[in-house]
């Protein structure tokens, strides 16, 4: 006769269902868009302040924004990306620059 614990062992079933139910979070690209008025130095400052890029990488991204119209600054989960976009846009407005930061699904 089978042991009662063998009949009631639901652990493998629950584990399988959990593995199938948990998906990795969606990722979003944070994008800086070019405009004709924001100084290049300010864009570099934003990249260093909000993304912790060194001066060389920040300058490369600033030039990408300038010449290609936009650049992906990083890829994050939705909450982190939305927060960065909001903080950057507020920082730009507080400093009277029209710099626009947006996000797109990666």
UniProtKB/Swiss-Prot annotation:
List GO BP terms, alphabetically.
protein catabolic process; proteolysis
Highest rank taxon of the organism:
Bacteria
Enumerate the Pfam families for this protein: ClpS
Role of this protein: Involved in the modulation of the specificity of the ClpAP-mediated ATP-dependent protein degradation.
Known HAMAP family for this protein?
Answer: ClpS
Under the subunit heading, UniProt states:
Binds to the N-terminal domain of the chaperone ClpA.
Q: Which family does it belong to?
A: Belongs to the ClpS family.
Q: What is this protein called?
A: ATP-dependent Clp protease adapter protein ClpS
Gene source species: Edwardsiella ictaluri (strain 93-146)
